[in-house]
Amino acid sequence: MFVSPPPATARNQVLGKRKSKRHDENPKNVQPNADTEMTNSVPSIGFNSNLPHNNQEINTPNHYNLSSNSGNVRSNNNFVTTPPEYADRARIEIIKRLLPTAGTKPMEVNSNTAENANIQHINTPDSQSFVSDHSSSYESSIFSQPSTALTDITTGSSLIDTKTPKFVTEVTLEDALPKTFYDMYSPEVLMSDPANILYNGRPKFTKRELLDWDLNDIRSLLIVEQLRPEWGSQLPTVVTSGINLPQFRLQLLPLSSSDEFIIATLVNSDLYIEANLDRNFKLTSAKYTVASARKRHEEMTGSKEPIMRLSKPEWRNIIENYLLNVAVEAQCRYDFKQKRSEYKRWKLLNSNLKRPDMPPPSLIPHGFKIHDCTNSGSLLKKALMKNLQLKNYKNDAKTLGAGTQKNVVNKVSLTSEERAAIWFQCQTQVYQRLGLDWKPDGMS
C-alpha cells in the first residue's frame, strides 16, 4: 500500500527537531552542519497554516540539502521518499483500525531501531501538529471506519441469527385447532342443504348426542395431515390454561399413508381414552373403518393402490367414522352399566319382599257369603281371623329371635340371558336415537 508523503515543510520541521535532539545527546558535542542550522532557524509553522507560495520555494532547497546529506532522497529532485517512522506509524494505525479485535491482545509495535522509538516519543508542538493533521487525513479514508468494520461483522452475525428459523414448540388449543373446515367435506355435502350446516361451517352429523362427544371431537380435529411451516419438523405441545381441563396432543396422519399406519394412529389416539375401551375392540373398529374406506376409494378411483392417496374429505371421513364407532360403543357400555345396576336393585328388592300371610282356604266355610251372615256368623269369622293373626305374630317373633337375618338376600347376580337382553336394549335405544341403521349385536 502506498502512503502519501507528508509536505516538505512539516518534514523539515520534524527532522530538524530530531537532529537537534541527537545533537544534544551527542557526548562528543559535534557541531551541526549548515543544513541543520538553517532548519533550526526556520520558525515553527503548523501544518494547517496557510503558507505563501514563495515560502515553500525558500524551504525547498534546504529540504533537498538535508535529504541528500542523510541519504533518504533519490537523485530525482521531484520525488520525496517517506521517512521510515511515518511508514511504521501508518502501518500500525492501519493494523489497529482493520483489526479491532486485536485490542484484547498486546499489539506488537515495530521498533527495530532505537531511532524509531525516539521518534515516537517526540512531544514538541510541531510534531504534535503534524501527527494531528496526519491522523486527520486518515479519518477521511476508508480505513478511518474501524467501528464500521466491527458493525458489519456483528451485523452479519446478527443477520445469520435472525435468518435462523425459530420454530414453535408450544401452541394453545385455539391455535392448534383448524380455523376452517370447508376442505374436510365434499362440495356435495356442504352445498346440498344449507340448513344442514352448523354455524362453524361443519355438517350437522358432526354434532352427536353422545357421551363426551364434544371433547373427543376436538381431539379428532387435532389429528393433522401435515406440519405447519412454523412447527418445523416436530409437532408442538398443546398447552391448556385450565387446571381441570384434559390434556390434548397433536397427531400426524399424512394423506398418503399405509393401512397399518392409519390403524395404528387411530388405535393409539386419545379418542375416548376415559372410557377405557379394550384394545381389541379399538383395533377391530379401526380395521373395519380402514377396510370400508379402502373399498370406497377403489370404487371411486377404479384402481387398487398399495398406499391410498386419500383426498382431504376421504381422510377426514376415516377419522370421523372411527370416532363414531368408539363413541357409540362408549355410550352403549355406559347405558348398560346404568341399566344393569337398576335391574339388580329391582331384583334384590323382589327377592327380599315379604308377602302377606293369608288364612288357609279350609278355615273359610264353603259357600260363606257376607249377606247371609248372622250375628253369630260374624262373630265366628272375627274369632277365626283373630286367632290366625295371633298365631302368625307368634311365629314371626320366634323366627326373628332365631335370627332370620340369614335369609335376607344382600346380593344378586344376573344370568347371561339377562345381561344379553339388557345389552340388546341399550344398543337398540342408542341406534334409534342417533338415526343409525345399525343392527344390535351380542355382548362384545
Curated annotation (Swiss-Prot):
Subcellular localization(s) per the UniProt record: Cell membrane; Nucleus
One biological process term in Gene Ontology: glucose metabolic process
Note, other: The prion state [GAR+] is provoked by the interaction of the two proteins STD1 and PMA1. It involves a complex between a small fraction of the cellular complement of PMA1, and STD1, a much lower-abundance protein, and it is transmissible by non-Mendelian, cytoplasmic inheritance. [GAR+] makes cells resistant to the glucose-associated repression of alternative carbon sources. In contrast to other prion forms, [GAR+] cannot be cured by GdnHCl or by inactivation of the molecular chaperone HSP104.
GO CC terms, sorted: nucleus; plasma membrane
Region of interest: Disordered: 1-77
Comp. bias (Polar residues): 28-64
Role summary: Involved in modulation of glucose-regulated gene expression. Together with MTH1, represses the hexose transporter (HXT) genes in conditions of low glucose. Stimulates the SNF1 kinase by an interaction with the catalytic domain that antagonizes autoinhibition and promotes an active conformation of the kinase.
Domain of life of the organism encoding this protein: Eukaryota
Biased composition (Low complexity): 65-77
Gene source species: Saccharomyces cerevisiae (strain ATCC 204508 / S288c)
Keyword Amino-acid biosynthesis listed: no
Membrane topology, from the record: Peripheral membrane protein
Molecular function, one GO term: protein kinase activator activity
Assembly and interaction partners: Interacts with SNF1 kinase; via catalytic domain. Interacts with the glucose sensors SNF3 and RGT2.
Family under the similarity heading: To yeast MTH1.
Pfam families: STD1 (PF17235)
Name of the molecule in the record: Protein STD1
Name of the gene encoding the protein in the UniProt record: STD1
Keyword entries, A-Z: Activator, Amyloid, Cell membrane, Membrane, Nucleus, Prion, Transcription, Transcription regulation
